């Protein structure tokens, strides 16, 4: 008589799941470079199971975000994850029971925010030895700095003309170029940022502007002439 019995243990199948990488720019919680939360790859389901793996809503934690995901973290490399309970499979019965889900976190990168200078114009008068006169100050474009960061433009930026521009070609070794308008010929040098959060910003100096060379004023005084009535010739040594 064989009445022996026992228990059967069915262990969970291991399911490796890797998350993809996401990229943001400091100051903007939206993804860049075509990235988004998602599953990069995973092991195949077994035992005839068929279904589509996805990420459970609300399960994501992302080191690239702070303040309840309302702001980006500082520039840097972080991770985002969901944990094993954050992976679900539509159409697979007892998915969480039958699989030991092991998740590899995805990278979450925050790039520096690129900020730009305002264009600036300059002018001079033909033949002037005083150089270019700048119309205003070198400044950052509006809304460049975010989150109340204490970052600003350092004093000392200077405005001149492009060495390879039309103004320089016309000027040569003279004090100024010919009178006229020289578009996109301004060059800004020495522009730097100062502050406590400099690592989160990248200053892009592609500012330019118009150089206007005004005509020089040339006063000309004419001499006096004298004639005698009835004779068109000059007298008194005039002429």
What is each of the regions a protein language model found here?
Residues 1-239:
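Short loop/turn motifs that initiate or flank beta-strands
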